[in-house]
Amino acid sequence: EDGIRDSVASRGRGDVYKRQVASVLRGFSAPVVLTQDLSDADRAHLLAHDTDPFNRWEQGRMLAYGSLLGMIREGKAPNKDWLAGIRAVIGDETLDPAYRALMLGLPSQSDLARALSEAGDTPDPDIIYAATEATRAAMADAFADLLPTLYRRHTVDAPFEPNAKQAGKRALSNAALSLLTRNDDGVLAQEQYDAADNMTQQLSALANLVRAGRGNKAVEAFEAQWKADRLVMDKWFGLQVMEAD
């Protein structure tokens, strides 16, 4: 009966009162733009642990923007909280492969330039490019122990089928390949190109070979194979422009 007649009484475990991070708009379906004053640590916590997939993606997007803009403006290193949060997401095999592939993406250089302009800063394309490349290199190093497993586990060995399951697995394995190529000089990309039974896998491998500086033969072989298909050749031209230094 102790405390029952008190006007105010408290009961519970001490750890319940630790500081909490709110997952605002969880499960909300309307297109709401919410401004939150969250620390990088809070955003990284939500990125790693939130049960709402959109909220996780949004916190990852905000952290990626903040990290890249800090690198561009002040020469900072990539945000370690963001890298740790992304690591938690891509290593979670309960999550959809396509979703994890999306989480490995970065804001485009044009979006970064727009964000700088809107903030009153003058975008420098060379600095934006360097920050983006440094971030991808940091991701390749931070996830080095996870990437080979992700690539092998989600490489599709079955005959090509245009379904969501295979597309998601291909997206994740190709996202992993893009980072792995930064540390293996394109060896794995060459293996994928040689073994590919569809254009998607070929094109992904080709882009990585070009990035690694060893794509000349593959570029010629791809042209010879697909030169009659105008849409595919548009992709062929595009990747060479995008990967050009």
Regions inferred by a protein language model and the residue ranges of each:
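Short, small-residue-biased leader/transition segments that mark boundaries at the very start
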Residues: 2-17
